[in-house]
From Swiss-Prot:
The gene is TRK1. It is a multi-pass membrane protein. This is Potassium transporter TRK1. Residues 74-90, 666-682, 794-810, 910-928 dip into the membrane without crossing it. It is found in: Cell membrane. Residues 186-203, 412-423 have a biased composition (Low complexity).
Length: 1056
């Protein structure tokens, strides 16, 4: 029995504790909202209408709660509640005359009506809508985060060892193949040499007398990790060649004639599919191809087939340079023949030009004038491989296509030996002096350290040429003359023009070979094809440049990031690209690189990407709610505690409060809340004049005034930035903070991007500084401040400048100040809301839609994205719109108070009335006052004038709101999707229009032509092109010489 009761209790307790109360609460809210929504949609069509409804509800409800005490007339109660609900702060009755209950109601009204509270409450509505209408958004967002974190950790963890891992993987693929080659009994390995025979690399050296030395060593993973070189065979398509030793050194090596090392046993790789058969088939195909030597008198060139023949080739063909065995031809261009299969078989299309660098020329016994430092004149050229440790690169027939004419060889084609990376930096200007100074061309494998990796020159010339012609040749004919990058020529003294073929290093792609296709980065010299039938020069058409003009680094030393998607593996990120991505996104909150337009407009998103973006936005909103709740509650409580401690420690001010029948603790909390919420009401009858010689109260209240309104977006972004910097890397917490920093206006109305935030901070400093300077110039030595120290006078001026923003405290009698100071305060109250209003509107994601500018693009081509255009537009709209209300209110009050104005009372003048109206419309609360009363000038108005002031308060409270559409206040429903789609289309059209305008401007000014806005564009473009071509012909003379090979024309270029 007890067992059954215990089980029943546990079962019901477990069910009770597992109840999702949030689910039932959301269902209840949804049930109520579904009943009200059809009617509310008609009454409240947009956010501005809803905001009006909320403020009016607080005003009426507050008056109903305050009036029953009957300490004042209802019009005064309505005036108080309107001032508390709009943060205007004007009073017609002394606040201390109200009861404690009435003061508490005003306290709560001001707390519930601040912009922080209202816009922060929208975050709860958006959060509810996310969880209600998106199934499992929390779980799906968490899964996306774990996926991104795992991928990032795998990428970062594998980056330091990526180089050795790749090499070991490639080397293991050919284990067990070397012994098959050794069984052939013939010297079928390519002719090459190695400077270090102790490395685990298979090498073969062929000297002049035909002495063959062949080394085969067993591969070792540890050796691969240390040196970066594995067992190299021609089946791997990885070729290394050491330049010939000087003849004096080669004579000593002839004693090793006939030495041959047999192959050591190699363990067979245990695989279901041995790649041996595939490489054997490739080898059999290659054995049937021969090389043909291109010979000419003094100068011989690489034998390159036509583009049509290259397209027809079905596989990559290896190229192994053969050393020149004729000492008498050391100063000539020696063709490099490719030995495949046997040493006698030559291929007819894979001759390679091997260029000898200056370092080897200086160390060798052979003299070659063209390689003399800073010399250019020579009649014969020696091309040779660079000495140094050979590194391993991987090739494929699937590669990215790059035009060999796009990069100008302005300086030597050499590696960057500082970072151990292979880089090509395209230049945009021609500099003939650099050509003369750097007349030598280095091989890609110059003297580099063990940490540096170089590309093999033996194969890239042919393979790159094949890939480069698979582009559409008719695509960019106009680029051959318009773009400076269209000329890839390199002048070698008076010799032939040479070009550099490029390719990218990429990771394997999944294809029919099972992911065994690779490309390498090669830098080879290619000669332009010439047409010898009619003696005319024909330049190859340049394919479109596919990459931006940035320095590309391809090296095994760099940290490579591998992403897996759609069954393929790509080299998506290097260390530099990851840094560029980090600059684009503050955190790793997306698994893809977004295309973001102006004001955080995401363009061209798939459904999966939209779901992931919605998940990160949901988590960002959830985190932002926590931050704002702590911010709002904390700054409402902590300053009150601080002031309470201070006033109880200051007997003078404590006795002052007690003598006025004010509780010191209540004064502390009411004053701190009035400062932070920009209410402007005080329990003391003279506002803040009692504390004009106390620095603590003025400084603390000034800080609260700023961070409660104008400075709130600044401090909020600063808090988020500090939290982001101190957050744990790759955490869910940091991802959300990064999204808030990058795309704040997608989540919150009062959180701006970095540049508008700095702009707001600058405006805040300038406006307050201006008020302080005016005060110090005109009123610092006024008799009103007799008995006040100079330091406190400056502090009073600074405090009063802060009060002109929104709060309306008075630390001095404003009616006694200089007239110019009063006018400056009037202007500052009028524009007090503009910094926030402009920041809200110019950072609105749907700003164009809200402004209604989607009809037609600007025909005049004005850049609407410029901040000055937005600021000017908003200022014109805001100021012109506000003046109508102010003038109308002044007109009505002048009619209602006509008799008082006729009395010519200096304290009840038109300027004083205008000052009161602007203070009410700007929701500031400053007043000129009236003698004999301890309230605002509004206390002297009649009922009609008070109603006008109430209307000014309510209307002015809505000046800082966005226009009808703002994504931060929209719910993620069909309407928001429609606006997103409209914004995306507009962003694309805008980009295309700007791109066309920029293109027309560039063509119109091509060749330093006049700017005419695109008129007579075609004639001017043709004229400028002809002018440029004529300058080229006038600036240089060219001569062509036909070589013995009919496919080559040697072109000699010399400057006139």
């Amino acid at each position: 029995m007890l067992y059954r009761v215990s089980g029943f209790y546990k079962r019901h307790t477990r069910n009770f504790t597992n109840i999702d109360y949030g689910y039932y609460i959301r269902n209840f809210i949804h049930h109520i909202a579904s009943k009200i929504y059809p009617y509310a949609k008609v009454v409240l069509p947009n956010f501005r209408a809803a905001h009006y409804f909320y403020i009016l509800t607080l005003v009426i409800l507050g008056s109903i709660l305050v009036y029953p005490v009957k300490t004042c007339a209802y019009i005064d109660v309505l005036f108080f509640t309107a001032g508390a609900s709009t943060q205007a702060g004007l009073n017609t009755v002394n606040v201390n005359d109200l009861s404690l209950y009435q003061q508490i109601v005003l306290y709560l009204l001001a707390t519930l009506a601040t912009p922080i509270f209202i816009h922060g409450s929208l975050l709860f509505v958006r959060l509810y809508y996310f969880e209600r209408h998106f199934d499992n958004i929390k779980e799906r967002s968490l899964m996306d985060y774990r996926m991104r974190k795992s991928a990032t950790l795998a990428r970062l963890g594998s980056a330091p060892t990526m180089s050795s891992t790749r090499l070991n993987t490639f080397n293991n693929q050919v284990l067990g193949f070397q012994e098959r080659e050794a069984e052939k009994g013939s010297s079928s390995s390519p002719q090459s040499s190695s400077s270090q025979t102790s490395q685990p690399v298979s090498t073969a050296y062929n000297d002049q007398g035909g002495n063959d030395i062949e080394h085969h060593s067993e591969p070792s993973d540890s050796d691969d990790d240390e040196s970066g070189n594995g067992p190299v065979t021609f089946q791997e398509k990885i070729h290394f060649e050491e330049p010939q030793r000087p003849r004096s050194q080669r004579r000593h090596s002839r004693t090793d004639s006939g030495i041959k090392f047999s192959a050591l046993p190699h363990p067979r790789r245990r695989k279901s599919i041995d790649p041996e058969d595939m490489y054997r088939s490739i080898n059999m195909l290659q054995e049937h191809k021969k090389n043909q030597e291109a010979k000419s008198k003094g100068i011989q060139f690489l034998n390159i087939g036509s583009p049509v023949r290259r397209k027809s080739r079905s596989s990559n063909i290896e190229a192994f340079p053969e050393e020149d065995t004729n000492p008498s031809r050391g100063d000539e261009i020696t063709p490099a023949t490719n030995s495949v299969g046997t040493g006698n078989n030559d291929e007819d299309e894979d001759d390679i030009l091997i260029i000898k660098p200056p370092i080897e020329i200086e160390n060798s016994d052979e003299a070659n004038p063209i390689f003399t430092k800073k010399k250019k004149l020579a009649s014969q050229i020696q091309f040779k491989e660079t000495p140094g440790k050979a590194k391993k690169w991987i090739t494929t027939k699937t590669r990215k296509h790059y035009n060999p004419w796009t990069s100008k060889l302005k300086k030597t084609l050499s590696n960057s030996s500082k970072k151990g990376s292979l880089s090509v930096v395209p230049t945009d200007t021609e500099d003939d002096s650099e050509d003369e100074e750097y007349a030598s061309i280095d091989s890609e494998t110059s003297d580099i350290s063990d940490n540096e990796h170089a590309a093999d020159n033996a194969e890239g010339s042919d393979v790159d040429s094949v890939g480069s012609y698979e582009e559409d040749e008719d695509e960019d004919e106009h680029n051959s003359d318009d773009d400076d990058d269209g000329e890839g020529e390199r002048r070698l003294g008076n010799g032939a023009s040479l070009t550099k073929a490029q390719s990218h290093l990429v990771l394997p792609s999944k294809d029919e070979t099972g992911g065994k296709k690779y490309t390498k980065r090669s830098n080879t010299l290619d000669t332009p094809q010439q047409n010898t039938s009619d003696g005319r020069k024909i330049r190859k058409k340049a394919p479109k440049r596919k990459t931006p003009r940035t320095q590309r680094n391809a090296s095994f030393n760099q940290h490579s990031n591998v992403s897996i998607g759609d069954g393929s593996i790509e080299n998506v990120d290097t260390n530099d690209s990851y840094q560029r991505l980090s600059r684009t996104m503050s955190g790793n909150y997306l698994s893809w690189t977004p295309t973001v337009g102006r004001n955080s407009t995401f363009i061209k998103l798939t459904d999966e990407q939209k779901e992931e973006l919605g998940g990160i936005e949901y988590r960002a909103v959830k985190l932002l709610i926590k931050i704002i709740v702590v911010y709002y509650v904390g700054f409402n409580i902590i300053p009150g505690v601080m002031l309470s401690i201070w006033i109880y420690c200051m007997p003078h001010y404590k006795n002052l409060m007690i003598s006025s029948s004010i509780s010191p603790a209540w004064w502390a909390f009411f004053t701190s809340q009035s400062s932070f919420n920009d209410l402007g009401l005080t329990l003391t009858s003279n506002s803040m004049m009692s504390f004009n010689q106390n620095a603590f109260v003025q400084i603390l209240c000034s800080f609260l005034i700023v961070i409660g309104n104008t400075g709130f977006p600044i401090l909020l972004r600063f808090i988020i930035w500090v939290m982001f910097k101190t957050a744990r890397p790759l955490s869910l917490y940091k991802e959300s903070l990064g999204f808030l920093l990058d795309h704040p206006r997608r989540c919150f109305t009062l959180l701006f991007p970095s540049v508008p935030t700095w702009w707001l901070f600058f405006i805040l400093v300038v406006l307050n500084g201006f008020d302080l300077v005016i005060f110090c110039i005109l009123d610092l030595h006024d008799d009103t401040f007799k008995g006040v120290d100079m330091g406190y006078r400056v502090l009073n001026g600074l405090f009063q400048a802060f009060c002109t923003r929104t709060v309306g405290f008075s630390v001095m009698d404003l009616s006694q100040l200089h007239a110019a100071t009063q006018v400056s305060y009037l202007i500052m109250m009028y524009i007090s809301v503009l910094p926030i209003a402009i920041s809200v509107r110019r950072t609105n994601v749907y700003e164009e839609q809200s402004l209604g500018v989607y009809a037609k693009e600007n025909a005049e081509g004005v850049d609407e994205s410029a901040p000055s255009n937005y600021v000017g537009s908003h200022l014109r709209n805001q100021l012109s719109y506000d003046l109508w209300y102010i003038c109308l209110g002044l007109f009505i009050i002048c009619i209602a108070e006509g008799k008082r104005l006729k009395e010519q009372d200096l304290r009840f003048s038109i300027f004083a009335v205008l000052f009161e109206i602007v203070s009410a419309y700007g929701t500031v609360g400053m007043s000129m006052g009236y003698p004999g009363v301890d309230c605002s000038l509004s206390g002297e108005f009649n009922v009609i004038s008070k109603l006008v002031i109430i209307a000014m308060m309510i209307r002015g409270r809505h000046r800082g709101l966005p226009y009808t559409i703002d994504r931060a206040i929209m719910l993620p429903n069909a309407a928001m999707k429609r606006h997103d789609r409209l914004q995306e289309e507009h962003a694309i059209n805008r980009h295309n229009t700007m791109e066309r305008t920029t293109t027309l401007g560039r063509v119109a000014t091509f060749g330093n032509g006049p700017i005419d806005g695109g008129n007579n564009l075609l004639t001017r473009a043709i004229t400028n092109i002809e002018h440029r071509l004529r300058n080229r012909r006038d600036g240089r003379s060219e001569s062509s010489t036909v070589s013995e090979d009919p496919r080559y024309v040697v072109r000699t270029v010399s400057e006139v």
